[in-house]
Amino acid sequence: MDASAEQSLPEPGSQDSVAGDDIEIVVNVGGVRQVLYGDLLSQYPETRLAELINCLAGGYDTIFSLCDDYDPGKREFYFDRDPDAFKCVIEVYYFGEVHMKKGICPICFKNEMDFWKVDLKFLDDCCKSHLSEKREELEEIARRVQLILDDLGVDAAEGRWRRCQKCVWKFLEKPESSCPARVVAVLSFLLILVSSVVMCMGTIPELQVVDSEGNRVEHPTLENVETACIGWFTLEYLLRLFSSPNKLHFALSFMNIVDVLAILPFYVSLTLTHLGARMMELTNVQQAVQALRIMRIARIFKLARHSSGLQTLTYALKRSFKELGLLLMYLAVGIFVFSALGYTMEQSHPETLFKSIPQSFWWAIITMTTVGYGDIYPKTTLGKLNAAISFLCGVIAIALPIHPIINNFVRYYNKQRVLETAAKHELELMELNSSSAESKPGGSRSDLDTLPPEPAAREGPSWGSRLKLSHSDTFIPLLTEEKHHRTRLQSCK
């Protein structure tokens, strides 16, 4: 553009620069120039680009409040933003919706949309799922960082009783916190295995003894080992309940309910045996005790507390609820159909084993699940053909949901590894920032401490840019109260 053309361009605030539908502007985002027109941008007047058209009627102060720089000669607005994200954002003016390209961080893209004042409702549903997933990941990272900070933090204002509770809770719930805590976790794991083995060995006739009443009971040595294990489980549960910050939530959590089910049958059976001996009703009491002893198998689920793999498998099964429901529904329909067909086709045989349709359900179940128990089997040609078809349908029904379940397991397992690593990196970054702040001469105040005070932070993680150092700042803090956390890290060193 020559000098005469540049002189003919209107200045901001002049009558010729008033926004119009035919006005043309140039937007330079991260070195990428884009020519836009007023009639296109005016479709969404609440967006930042539409405000650029309107601000031409104002002064330079209005313009520089919306962009990083402005060239009046070229009527070009400069922004130090992500050009790739900008190309996606301006799609709203052409297509009425926004799609996020692959490889762009969903949280950063959301910040870009906020900067350009494009509402999230224009983001397509296929992209909102990625944003929601990334938000959940950051929330989980923030939660883990907060838990670690709570464990590291020592509040001098707290009483000795409260500090003791925190130490006990950390000792029992955080095996990685210290070597003694790791030893206790390993010991608890071994005792779970020992108690489970003892429970199984107690049912071996060769290891049982005969009591004074002539009944076969467990060997006294096995009973003593089980009593010792139950004593350890009881002590562990009571200490964890005593040190829990939220006792109601602790008591209602699944793993703690499993702990209660693992130790409660022992005390109930002991009480019933004592009362039965006094009331001379040993027969009924022994039946109740035997029923309660079955509940001892719940202690094997205590292993899930010490195994991240079992927890991941449980979560994968929860996430695969739809696939499992589809499998059960498919099997239920197949069992009903093939059992009815098998019963009908086998009635012509004089020695048929299919006495009724409900009785044929058992045959259909073991056939479709590829077990083939063999107590009930078809004898006619049509019955055998029906069995072959039911077998093939069962194989297909079981194989279909396996792949989604495995994918959910692998995805969640990898996600947990990534979240753990991200939480550790976030803590290392906080500690590095606190160390650099302490190394500065004249005190431990950093540049962050000299910033103007922030408005009251809302609870939970902050997704927006908290430190507005420039229009281009894309810092995404995981936690809102950064100064507070930095101080706590300093005090924990």
UniProtKB/Swiss-Prot annotation:
Q: Where in the cell is it found?
A: Cell membrane
Q: Which GO cellular component does the record give, naming just one?
A: voltage-gated potassium channel complex
Entry membrane topology:
Multi-pass membrane protein
* Intramembrane residue stretches from the record: 358-378
What CDD domains does the database record attribute to this sequence? BTB_POZ_Kv5_KCNF1
Among Gene3D superfamilies, the record links this protein to: 1.10.287.70, Potassium Channel Kv1.1, Chain A, Voltage-gated potassium channels. Chain C
Q: In which tissues is it expressed?
A: Expressed in brain namely in the piriform cortex, olfactory tubercle, and medial habenular nucleus. Also expressed in the medial amygdaloid nuclei and the lateral amygdaloid area.
Name one matching Pfam family.
BTB_2
One Gene Ontology term of the biological-process aspect is: potassium ion transmembrane transport
Q: How does it assemble?
A: Heterotetramer with KCNB1 or KCNB2.
Q: Which residues lie on this side of the membrane: Cytoplasmic?
A: 1-183, 245-249, 311-324, 407-493
Q: What is this protein called?
A: Voltage-gated potassium channel regulatory subunit KCNF1
Residues forming the motif Selectivity filter are 370-375
MF terms (GO), sorted A to Z: potassium channel regulator activity; voltage-gated potassium channel activity
The organism named in the record is: Rattus norvegicus (Rat)
The record's similarity note reads:
Belongs to the potassium channel family. F (TC 1.A.1.2) subfamily. Kv5.1/KCNF1 sub-subfamily.
Q: Which UniProt keywords apply?
A: Cell membrane, Ion channel, Ion transport, Membrane, Potassium, Potassium channel, Potassium transport, Transmembrane, Transmembrane helix, Transport, Voltage-gated channel
Side of membrane Extracellular, spans: 205-223, 271-289, 346-357, 379-385
RNA-binding: present as a keyword of the record? no
Q: Does the keyword Cytoplasm apply?
A: no
For this protein, the parts annotated as crossing the membrane are 184-204, 224-244, 250-270, 290-310, 325-345, 386-406
